[in-house]
From Swiss-Prot:
This is Sec-independent protein translocase protein TatA. The chain crosses the membrane at residues 1-21. Pfam families: TatA_B_E. The gene is tatA. It is a single-pass membrane protein. The Tat system comprises two distinct complexes: a TatABC complex, containing multiple copies of TatA, TatB and TatC subunits, and a separate TatA complex, containing only TatA subunits. Substrates initially bind to the TatABC complex, which probably triggers association of the separate TatA complex to form the active translocon. It comes from Ehrlichia ruminantium (strain Welgevonden). Disulfide bonds: none annotated. Signal peptide: none annotated. Belongs to the TatA/E family.
Length: 56
């Protein structure tokens, strides 16, 4: 089930209410850093697993 435009809008409004307009850039920055770190860890893990398979 995909999110429609109204659901995305509602989620953004709830986030804005919870964190306020002043903190929103900081929250989004931290979220972006977290996603970037997750992608890097997944990439590193994939590289490590392929190296382990090649050593067999």
């Amino acid at each position: 089930m995909a999110l429609g435009p109204w659901q995305i809008f509602l989620i953004l409004v709830i986030i804005l209410v919870l964190f306020g307009a002043g903190k929103l850039p900081d929250v989004m920055s931290d979220l972006g850093k977290g996603i970037r770190n997750l992608k890097q860890e997944l990439k590193d893990n994939k590289l490590a697993s392929t190296e382990d398979e090649s050593n067999l």
